Amino acid sequence: MQKQTLPLVFINLDKDSERRTRIEGQLAHLGLPGERLPAVWWKHLPPAEQSLLYSAERNHGLYYQPLVDGEKGCYASHIQAWRQLLASDAPALVVLEDDVRLTPQFADVVNAIAALQ
């Protein structure tokens, strides 16, 4: 199997150590290196940063209901991952949630994507 060359991160809240252990075990089992990306806890963000990331008014015009804090934190965590990619020289970034269940074929898929470079 070709060595995976795409960076891979998993989003994980500081308090969820069991989830971290589980995803790290799955990645190790598949032979994939992964880096923990600390998840954003929405309530801990300063209001000024919250307003840069989310607008209740814009959301209301586009969707049926406002996002709850957990959804906003998830969204902000993914933005953090995009920023990490943009700050790097990598052509792509694999972003996982810490509660994902990886299939045995996942490493092959990542390697196939990496081979497209």
What are the functions of these language-model segments?
Residues 1-96, 100-117:
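An acidic/histidine-cluster motif and surrounding catalytic segment
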